[in-house]
Amino acid sequence: MKKEPILSVKDLSVSFQMYDNGLEKYDLKVISNLTLDVRPGEIVAIAGSSGSGKSLLAHAVMGLLPENASISGEISYKGKVLSQKEKEALRGKEMALVPQSVSYLDPLMKVGTQVRGRKADKEIIKAQREIFRRFHLDEKTEQ
């Protein structure tokens, strides 16, 4: 028996309001009618060429689209359709976006230090380490 999806995207379409050279307004459709379910314990890879909408999908799920974006469809988390406000409340607590480029991290610095900042108090360090443990990032990230 299949588990219920933890994340469900149904008929997601994303477009941007743009202007051409003559300042005529038009909609640039970037994602059209995408449906996706992610169940607990699954690992899902979104693959595609540069500019195909992978990051845009993640931004839509996280509620991080710019002002000129238009979105339709449903994004549900744990069975509940999410509003923009609910996406913002979950962001950084139950949902996070890992950037596609690991070059954002300095390979000569400890990862933990980069994530939390150099002058972190004990509570911040403890919270960061707990999050790393949750995602199976061991102590080597601190070395």
Regions found by a protein language model. Give the residues of each.
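ABC ATPase nucleotide-binding domain
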Residues: 8, 35-37
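The feature captures the beta-strand-to-loop junction immediately N-terminal to the Walker
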Residues: 47-49
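Helix-to-loop junction immediately C-terminal to a conserved catalytic motif
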Residues: 62-65
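Conserved ABC transporter NBD signature motif
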Residues: 70-81
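ABC ATPase NBD coupling module
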Residues: 81-96
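Q-loop/switch helix immediately C-terminal to the Walker
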Residues: 101, 107-121
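Conserved ABC ATPase "signature" region
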Residues: 125-141
